[in-house]
Amino acid sequence: MVRKRALGLAGSALTLVLGAVGFTAPAQAAPSCPAGSLCTYSGTGLSGARTVIPASDMEKAGTDGVKLPASARSFANGTHFTLRYGPARKVTCVRFPCYQYATVGKVAPGAQLRSLPSPGATVTVGQDLGD
């Protein structure tokens, strides 16, 4: 009887420890974005399908720009550039280094933008539409 009670208490203690681990484990982190890249996500709040654009690709494209998926709804800036974004005629653009037509905001390096200012707009990285 004493042995059964000891085993029962040990089992309860194990359950409490495992339960505590479950409750104290950190929440799942947002999808990662490789260093030196701009990542777009199809959902708001950095969720959904991810597209990775290396900063080197954006620089190589120059003023032609790199088109991102029309489904882009949020992005993480893992580059060393400050990103500016905003409506520019019919598109939302990100320009390196920081030239933007009708800029409405900017994202510092390493920052995460939970949702784009105009969902559904095409995002072009590196396209220079002038000031």
Swiss-Prot record:
Cysteines paired by S-S bonds: 33-39, 93-98
InterPro entries: Antimic/Inh_G_crystallin-like, G_crystallin-like
Key words of the record: Disulfide bond, Metalloenzyme inhibitor, Metalloprotease inhibitor, Protease inhibitor, Signal
One MF term in the entry's GO annotations: peptidase inhibitor activity
Pfam families to which the protein is assigned, alphabetical: Inhibitor_I36
Protein's UniProt keywords contain Nucleotidyltransferase: no
Ranges in coiled-coil conformation: none
Extra remark: Thermolysin slowly cleaves only the peptide bond following Cys-93.
General function of this protein: Inhibits microbial metallo-proteinases, such as thermolysin, but not serine, thiol, or carboxyl proteinases.
Designated name of the protein: Metalloproteinase inhibitor
Native source species: Streptomyces nigrescens
